[in-house]
Amino acid sequence: MSTLPSTDPPPLPASTSSQQPAVHIPPPSYLDPTTYPQTLYLDPERIFIELTYHPLSPSTYLAHTRSPAAGANVLFLGTTRDTFEDKPVARLAYTSYAPLALRTLSSIARDAVAKHGLCGVSIAHRLGDVAVGEESIAIAISAPHRGAAWRAGEEVLEECKRRVEIWKREEFVGEPPGQGEWRANRDTDPEGKSTS
């Protein structure tokens, strides 16, 4: 009578030590701050996208969108404020799945260019810790006329908050570092009221 082979996995080799050697597995590149900034520049649309762990540079983002055809340049800077729902904020900490976030940001920018006839769009977002008073997002819009620039700037911001794969942890004064509340950027409306 024949027997079927065992489906059990083979035994592991005996270890000569009670401690297994530590294996270092590096983080994926999108979680490694040394691989940043990560940028996209789409020409001829004049679209500049950046994810960075460094302070934002508003003049750089305006420079990428300026055009002789533009009669209006609008810059929005989203800044870490010192309180949230009456709790004192120590800092915000942002994380992202960068490969997808870059794709989503470029899609938002392309949609805005097509819809509003823009001359250029820059979107930059900070990752990592962002202290009170520092910018976490910069949006620069260049358009032939101010109405299109203002409308596009607000739409781009709201689409970023609604769609981009970036999450934030609000850390409050008096809490241990690394603690806090994780939130999606879309958890508040344009006036700061909670939507959840």
Swiss-Prot record:
Residues 1-29, 174-196 are annotated as: Disordered. This is Molybdopterin synthase catalytic subunit. GO terms for cellular component: molybdopterin synthase complex. The gene is cnxH. InterPro entries: MoaE_sf, MOCS2B_euk, Mopterin_biosynth_MoaE. The keyword NAD does not apply. Heterotetramer; composed of 2 small (MOCS2A) and 2 large (MOCS2B) subunits. Its EC number is 2.8.1.12. Residues 183-196 have a biased composition (Basic and acidic residues). Catalytic subunit of the molybdopterin synthase complex, a complex that catalyzes the conversion of precursor Z into molybdopterin. Acts by mediating the incorporation of 2 sulfur atoms from thiocarboxylated MOCS2A into precursor Z to generate a dithiolene group. Keywords: Cytoplasm, Molybdenum cofactor biosynthesis, Transferase. GO terms for molecular function: molybdopterin synthase activity. Pathway: Cofactor biosynthesis; molybdopterin biosynthesis. It catalyses: 2 [molybdopterin-synthase sulfur-carrier protein]-C-terminal-Gly-aminoethanethioate + cyclic pyranopterin phosphate + H2O = molybdopterin + 2 [molybdopterin-synthase sulfur-carrier protein]-C-terminal Gly-Gly + 2 H(+).
